[in-house]
Amino acid sequence: MTNPYVAQMRQWRQTLTKDQRWAILISADPDALASALALKRIMAHRVRGVDIFRINEVTRPDNLAMIRYLRIPAKLWQPEKADLYTNFAMVDSQPHHNPAFQGITFDLIIDHHPLTAGQLPQAPFCDIRPGFGATSTMMTRYLQGLRIKPGPLLSTALLYGIRTDTATFERSGGEDDLRAYQWLIKHADATLLRRIIRSEYLRAWLPLFSRAFRSLRDCRG
């Protein structure tokens, strides 16, 4: 039986044309970065261009490491450049989540966060399923349904997106998330994943280092 969500995506994909230039807007975190990269892959060779934009500064070591090691081209959004694009997409968020999204007409919205009463997103393609632990899981299901094999960088990004949003399945996540995770492991780059995960520990240790240095100064008078 054909997955209705995949069928919807396949139909939407057929509407893409070479005269379109898309901007994917995200509030950058691992799940959003991975999902945007997956959407860019789904749209590859079907439109004139696809750019990923983040509305926030990226400062966390793990997010910076993810962008660096997985070569994610996420640029800072500049509203004055909106006229350069014909279409706008959003993943792992909804228009009312941030004022930076206001005033933009989105043609595609994909998210796993709960809907808010009175704030129902409107877009020609809109897929919001709170039952998933991560938007990366939804994007993985799309890739599987479209028979698109993700390369090592994209697979690692999606794997890390699921890992962070589910807290490695300790906070959330269901069977769909676990299956997507297991499928992505086969295609991901284990070395790059370890490097990104190590950067998480750096972020966690920084406050400890700071306290240790303060204590050392206090002991020395």
Regions found by a protein language model. Give the residues of each.
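A structured phosphate/pyrophosphate-recognition subdomain
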Residues: 1-28, 37-44, 117-221
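Extended aliphatic helical segments
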Residues: 6, 47-50, 55-58, 91, ...
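Anionic-ligand anchoring segments at beta-strand to alpha-helix junctions in alpha/beta enzyme folds, i.e.
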Residues: 18-81
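Generic detector of well-ordered alpha-helical packing
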Residues: 30-32, 93, 112, 166
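Hydrophobic/aromatic residues located in beta-strands of well-ordered beta-sheets
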Residues: 50-52, 107, 158
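Short secondary-structure boundary/hinge segments and terminal tails
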Residues: 61, 84-86, 161
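Active-site cofactor/cluster-binding pocket
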Residues: 65-125
